[in-house]
């Protein structure tokens, strides 16, 4: 039995008070949620403190909340911020736990079967278990997730029903407890004690929950009764205290009891017979043989071990679902009355829509060629309409909400005023004739004031030619193209901020992490060429790159003013007017954001002999590269321990680059 706490309150801890537009945005959002409104949009300009507003809303409505971001990096940033705002509540992190993932696939044209290959990040797996167990144990939970949250997960009912509940005084034999732990996929290992394992010493059983990384539990027996339960330091065995109740959650999310397993196996066998008959009728004897061999092996593993690699492909039978019925996901672990917040919704909702189709086409190939049963098609992400059916109340958060969000609700709450008093930049349009020389003059003016410039082009060739020309003119310039790896991109941004160079040229400057307060000029070339990066939303987002500097200015080079340009210019001018009026009324002088320049790169390129020396990895010999990989692994673990997953991911990418040279 799980002790589910329902009366905890969210407690927001912050040295800030709501300011600017934040108080009215918070009040409106909270009133609408408490009034039962299903969907609303928080349209917050860049740098207006949207995450703080979200935190205030969560603390006031006091509902379990799912925050979805469109990639792991942003989810990690949000997770860190919410952990700071809610240190006394359960802030959890749920993203894909794969460091590396090659999905199972088949390419008919070359008759190539690609087996599933993956590397699981143990730390993230722990955090996923922490998220699901927290949702079943308490009400004050915020889960920050990527779109992984719409992928199939085991049944929450089976997961909860499988919990092993222990108390001092409970009559249960030691052997019965050991069997119960094995049933929920715990592994006995008396030597290597890790998450998801237990060890036995006489009448003492030590259990290391899947959701922990440092603390384990020592269950002491007296005969066939639990005498006491202690929380201990897993590494040293030091006793931390006694507990009066312990709920051990399964070591995997795909878990089922013996009765359900027998039913599931019978259904898998029946489906196998059906599919074999179909293949034989069509003369597909190779496919039939392939399917029979693989499925019978999986059935044997399920019968003997209760688990097999790829068990998720049989989840429909395990869960007792009908064909085509949506899978259980993280959303099913939440209670009925919960809140969803979609960060950067103009990007995230598009991802949620697209996940199903990509997964379906790959799996159909596996089914058609006898690598999987048709029921594998039901191990999938949710369709968008299935996601919508889980929505009780939702807030879309974006500076530029998409068409989908605007179709869902007419309730749009604006947050335009920045706590720093910074204004949206001035935008002007200049003709393309003589644009490069004109831009050169603007760049030189910024260089004299120790300010930086972003230039965005539409083609790779234009970006390269422009970079070469400016270099010839004596400008310190770099070109950031799509092939640049994560770590190198971080290094480029850091060098730009430090003044190693003054101008950054790129095609897409909307990626996360490219917010540079030192940038006072954004130049948009070919602004009148309609497309993804030159539509209204793309232009507004690009203009926002100059909104962190009090001298922010945007120049669009174009021969005509398109509707997208005009709407972006009008919207920026509207916001700027509101911001100026607010500043004037309250006597606020805009101040450029002061943002610490974190030295990520020196961390990853440190060499043992000279701490601050940076090296070119290509110049290292094999032994030096091996030593560097060891150092990087240690630094990656240190970053993980302080929950800085963004840094950890960047160090990991650096490690992969070093390993690739061997």
Swiss-Prot record:
SMART domains xref list: DEXDc, HELICc
Cellular localisation: Cytoplasm
Nucleotide-binding listed as a keyword: yes
Top-level taxon of the source organism: Bacteria
Helicase C-terminal domain location: 435-601
Binding site for ATP: 44-51
Motif segment (Beta-hairpin): 97-120
HAMAP family in the cross-refs: UvrB
Free-text comment about domains: The beta-hairpin motif is involved in DNA binding.
Protein name: UvrABC system protein B
Organism the protein comes from: Streptococcus pneumoniae serotype 2 (strain D39 / NCTC 7466)
